[in-house]
């Protein structure tokens, strides 16, 4: 009896997880494509000259006490560089960069020296975040964990 219930629960969890996984795989690339086709707002600042640009970003500050926003036809960018004992943060739009890369949303690239990184995102004011992971990627991680747990439960209940 327990084995039959275990199989039913494991199969049910696996089916639900597969459905969410499929939806997520369709949803995330569509969100990434939006970065290239619509205008978004990005913070534009440099912590070297504007203390409001530093991490952690003050989300509770009034708009006038936050760094300026700019309209962006691309992705928002956050660059972090460690110079001597100081962390320098720069927030901007990809249209200001002189690079020709295929832009992939919610990706961070480490500097070859290991002294900094550059992250890209495609939601309004997303470059204010300390880590530029979107809810979609958090959802994808949760789904991956759920698949692993449901498989493990199925294995344990089938013994």
Curated annotation (Swiss-Prot):
A lipid is attached at residue 127 (GPI-anchor amidated asparagine). One of its GO terms (cellular component) is side of membrane. It is a lipid-anchor; GPI-anchor. The keyword Cytoplasm does not apply. Residues 128-159 form a propeptide. Residues 1-33 form the signal peptide. The chain crosses the membrane at residues 137-157. One of its GO terms (biological process) is sleep. Expressed in mushroom body (at protein level); overlaps with expression of Sh/shaker and nicotinic acetylcholine receptor (nAChR) components also involved in sleep regulation. Expressed in the adult brain and head. Enriched in the mushroom body, anterior optic tubercle, superior protocerebrum, antennal nerve and visual projection neuron fibers projecting into the lobula plate of the optic lobe. N-glycosylated probably on Asn-58. It comes from the Eukaryota. Residues 78-91 are annotated as: Loop 2. It holds the Pfam family QVR. Keywords: Biological rhythms, Cell membrane, Disulfide bond, Glycoprotein, GPI-anchor, Lipoprotein, Membrane, Signal, Transmembrane, Transmembrane helix. Residues 55-68 are annotated as: Loop 1. GO terms for molecular function: GPI anchor binding. Glycans are attached at residue 58. It is found in: Cell membrane; Membrane raft. Disulfide bonds join 42-76, 45-53, 72-93, 108-119, 121-126. Interacts (via loop 2 of the three-fingered Ly-6 domain) with Sh/shaker; this interaction may stabilize both components of the complex and may be required for targeting or retention of Sh/shaker to neural cell projections. Interacts (via loop 2 of the three-fingered Ly-6 domain) with nAChRalpha3 and potentially other nicotinic acetylcholine receptors; this interaction is required for antagonism of nicotinic acetylcholine receptors. Belongs to the quiver family. Consists of a single Ly-6 domain, adopting a three finger fold stabilized by 5 disulfide bonds. The first loop contains a region essential for protein folding or that is required for localization to the cell surface. The second loop mediates protein-protein interactions. Bifunctional regulator of neuronal activity in the mushroom body, and possibly other regions of the brain, that acts as a signaling molecule required for homeostatic regulation of sleep under normal conditions and after sleep deprivation. Reduces neuronal excitability by enhancing Sh/shaker K(+) channel activity; possibly by stabilizing Sh/shaker to increase protein levels, accelerating its activation kinetics, slowing C-type inactivation and enhancing recovery from inactivation. Specifically affects the A-type K(+) current. This is UPAR/Ly6 domain-containing protein qvr. The gene is qvr.
